[in-house]
């Protein structure tokens, strides 16, 4: 049995208190607690506490400490239940305490996976223009349940997905100006798949791109790659030269007709 002999406010934190006790051998430092724990357990000078009571106080102090760590972590941005659990595990907090902290955070509405999923979907679709497949995968990795994800994705309509995908295409296609139209389409297709768009949405967007095919830019790309390969393969003669040129340009996405026209032009120049 111990008796509390003195309670002092810590110099560095006005919300923490040092508790001094006497176990029969004079006053000594016992432990420190948060103000919440001080009030919860009615700690005051003269109070007698046994080992069981002390263990309970110290356990609740650990819970409060972990709770405040979680609150601080949440102050930067919203988090999912799993993210909080993982954060506390990295802090080497025990599972029993983690469960209590998460339960309290849920009760106090500091964490809510449904609200998180809705806001996350809006941000990733409107700001980063990610497709639903990527958003779903990211939410699953954050521990959000399938049904919650399905609900959050309902407001991400197909029309909005197409709008976002077309914006991404418009931004990216400028960097493919030296590619053939076919190769540009393939690269844009790959980009949209990485961004998380469905095959259906990608096909619709690339069909719209087909209507914008620029013959002049296609010719510029053909001449750019054609001249580059011409310099590379001009050391070869006859059939070998033409075969290597055709293979190289075909791999770049140019049609046989386009390649033949380019080679004919080179023959006339030569």
Curated annotation (Swiss-Prot):
List the Pfam families hit by this protein, alphabetically: RecX_HTH1, RecX_HTH2, RecX_HTH3
Function field:
Modulates RecA activity.
Where exactly are the transmembrane stretches of this chain? Answer: none
UniProt KW keywords: Cytoplasm
Family, according to the entry, reads as follows: Belongs to the RecX family.
- What high-level taxonomic lineage is stated for the organism? Bacteria, Bacillati, Bacillota, Bacilli, Bacillales
Originating species: Bacillus anthracis
Q: Among the record's GO biological process terms, what is one?
A: regulation of DNA repair
**What's the protein called, per UniProt?**
Regulatory protein RecX
Q: Which GO terms describe its cellular component?
A: cytoplasm
- Subcellular location as annotated: Cytoplasm
């Amino acid at each position: 049995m111990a008796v509390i002999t003195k309670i002092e406010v810590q110099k560095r934190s006005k919300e923490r208190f040092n508790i001094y006790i006497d176990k029969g051998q004079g006053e000594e430092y016992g432990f420190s607690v948060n103000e919440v724990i001080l009030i919860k357990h009615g700690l005051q000078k003269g109070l007698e506490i046994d080992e069981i009571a002390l263990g309970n106080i110290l356990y609740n102090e650990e819970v409060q400490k972990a709770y405040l760590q979680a609150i601080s972590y949440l102050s930067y941005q919203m988090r999912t239940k799993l993210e909080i659990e993982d954060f506390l595990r990295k802090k080497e907090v025990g599972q029993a305490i983690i469960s209590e902290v998460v339960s309290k955070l849920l009760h106090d509405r500091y964490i809510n996976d449904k609200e998180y999923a809705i806001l996350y979907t809006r941000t990733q679709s409107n700001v980063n223009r990610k497709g639903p497949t990527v958003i779903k995968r990211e939410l699953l990795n954050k521990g959000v349940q399938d049904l919650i994800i399905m609900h959050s994705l309902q407001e991400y309509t197909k029309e909005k997905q197409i709008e976002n995908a077309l914006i991404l295409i418009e931004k990216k296609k400028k960097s493919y100006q030296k590619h053939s139209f076919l190769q540009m389409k393939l690269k844009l297709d790959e980009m949209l798949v990485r961004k998380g768009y469905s095959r259906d949405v990608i096909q619709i967007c690339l069909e719209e791109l087909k209507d914008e095919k620029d013959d002049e830019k296609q010719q510029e790309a053909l001449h750019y790659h054609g001249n580059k390969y011409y310099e590379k393969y001009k050391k070869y003669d006859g059939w070998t030269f033409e075969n290597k040129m055709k293979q190289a340009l075909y791999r770049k996405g140019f049609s046989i007709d386009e390649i033949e026209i380019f080679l004919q032009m080179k023959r006339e120049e030569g």
